[in-house]
Amino acid sequence: MAHHIPPLNFGMVADDLYRSGQPNELNFPFLEKLQLKKIIFLAPDDPSQQFQNFVEDQDIELIHLGMDTHQNPWNPISEEIVISALKIILNPDNYPLHIMCNLGRHRTGTVVGCLRKLQRWNLTSIFEEYRRFAGSKVKLLNEQFIELFDTDLVTYNNAPQWLYLS
């Protein structure tokens, strides 16, 4: 019997939209159950070969947005990458969809935080969610990025229904 162990920092963002850190082979049976169509990978480095093989075997489209060669990996994620990720997230044709980075903390948390701004969550709630996943590794620059993020930069037509429920 296969065990269904979620990846590090796994969470459900909305219906058929998930977040986590990069999974390992122990997490693959769990991910299979999600029947993912696409994965947004936000880490600057390549995903592990095991993970790439899993994605290929499951016929999941892997979208690697984290490769920003002009940026120090310790800096916050770029606005361009966040906007690209949000455009993918706001297209219901991409669901079920999973957002991830190496540990599911900072890059993923920043994208989800900006998504929450689009949903018109208040900043206190956005930061509470970010901090829940970041733990003791909170980066104030990421919180500042989320706070100052201009949601008008994100254009979408046919967004998921849950975007309008808040």
From Swiss-Prot:
EC number: 3.1.3.48
Enzyme class: hydrolase
Keywords associated with the record: Cytoplasm, Hydrolase, Protein phosphatase
Recorded GO CC terms: cytoplasm
Stretches assigned to the Tyrosine-protein phosphatase domain: 9-162
Name of a matching Pfam family: Y_phosphatase2
Domain of life: Eukaryota
Catalytic activity: O-phospho-L-tyrosyl-[protein] + H2O = L-tyrosyl-[protein] + phosphate
Active site: 101 (phosphocysteine intermediate)
Subcellular location: Cytoplasm
InterPro entries per record: PFA-DSPs, Prot-tyrosine_phosphatase-like, Siw14-like, TYR_PHOSPHATASE_DUAL_dom
Molecular function terms, GO-annotated: phosphatase activity; protein tyrosine phosphatase activity
Signal sequence, renumbered to the chain: none
Family: Belongs to the protein-tyrosine phosphatase family.
UniProt-recorded name of the protein: Probable tyrosine-protein phosphatase DG1060
Source organism (scientific name): Dictyostelium discoideum
